Amino acid sequence: MKRINALTIAGTDPSGGAGIQADLKTFSALGAYGCSVITALVAQNTRGVQSVYRIEPDFVAAQLDSVFSDVRIDTTKIGMLAETDIVEAVAERLQRYQIQNVVLDTVMLAKSGDPLLSPSAVATLRSRLLPQVSLITPNLPEAAALLDAPHARTEQEMLEQGRSLLAMGCGAVLMKGGHLDDEQSPDWLFTREGEQRFTAPRIMTKNTHGTGCTLSAALAALRPRHTNWADTVQEAKSWLSSALAQADTLEVGHGIGPVHHFHAWW
């Protein structure tokens, strides 16, 4: 079986629970070789974001050229893009190199509530990047921001917003329902072929730092092994549930700790 080369395009987390660091751990845990392009240096920890240093868009583009001109990339995950010019740089390079299997984690807020994407960049992400990606993974606040609509409060509203996002041109949408007041924490997958509901019991832990990054990276790493998104989502969610179930064993930081990416090994 061909080895999978996976790329993450995202910001950093020096505490290791989110961003590039979480993505590379996820790739390794799921048997993919990880490459990375850094969009922002983020001073953050389990308590929140202290500072963000955005990488110059030209240097983001140069990193992408370095990877795409040399390494066969089978799958890509995009996370924090920070600002409009970086969104433009990434969109242009994806188009230039005809990159396939792209998962976009529509990162706008950190778990702590700190902003990670400027408001002006949302419109550019919507118009330039969404039509090029295979899957987007918004939570309910992110979906509302993309649609410039109120936050979905019911599962029916969540369904309506997922369909609206799919109509914006991306290949598929995984709407994450963790913000709903529902014990099952339903997620909905929207594709051109249909819709599917996924549920999993809520795992009682405060240590959920980087779950969005980790899920989107898992979806990217696993997609080349499956023929459809439904099977990919099922495996990724199952793996993440195990990582969450073991999160409390890590004892990292004094705030919202990370999930255990390597729960299968130690």
Curated annotation (Swiss-Prot):
Pathway membership of this protein? Cofactor biosynthesis; thiamine diphosphate biosynthesis; 4-amino-2-methyl-5-diphosphomethylpyrimidine from 5-amino-1-(5-phospho-D-ribosyl)imidazole: step 2/3; Cofactor biosynthesis; thiamine diphosphate biosynthesis; 4-amino-2-methyl-5-diphosphomethylpyrimidine from 5-amino-1-(5-phospho-D-ribosyl)imidazole: step 3/3
Record InterPro entries: HMP/HMP-P_kinase_dom, PM/HMP-P_kinase-1, Ribokinase-like
Q: What EC number(s) does this enzyme carry?
A: 2.7.1.49, 2.7.4.7
Q: Name one GO cellular component term.
A: cytosol
Question: Reaction(s) catalyzed by this protein?
Answer: 4-amino-5-hydroxymethyl-2-methylpyrimidine + ATP = 4-amino-2-methyl-5-(phosphooxymethyl)pyrimidine + ADP + H(+); 4-amino-2-methyl-5-(phosphooxymethyl)pyrimidine + ATP = 4-amino-2-methyl-5-(diphosphooxymethyl)pyrimidine + ADP
Q: Could you tell me which Pfam families the record lists for this protein?
A: Phos_pyr_kin
> What Gene Ontology molecular function terms does this protein carry?
ATP binding; hydroxymethylpyrimidine kinase activity; phosphomethylpyrimidine kinase activity
Q: What does the entry give for GO biological process?
A: thiamine biosynthetic process; thiamine diphosphate biosynthetic process; thiamine salvage
Where does the chain bind 4-amino-5-hydroxymethyl-2-methylpyrimidine? Q44
SUPFAM superfamilies assigned = Ribokinase-like
- Which enzyme type, at the first EC level? transferase
Keyword annotations for this protein?
A: ATP-binding, Kinase, Nucleotide-binding, Thiamine biosynthesis, Transferase
Functional note: Catalyzes the phosphorylation of hydroxymethylpyrimidine phosphate (HMP-P) to HMP-PP, and of HMP to HMP-P. Shows no activity with pyridoxal, pyridoxamine or pyridoxine.
Q: Which family does it belong to?
A: Belongs to the ThiD family.
Q: How does it assemble?
A: Monomer.
Q: What is this protein called?
A: Hydroxymethylpyrimidine/phosphomethylpyrimidine kinase
Species of origin reads: Escherichia coli (strain K12)
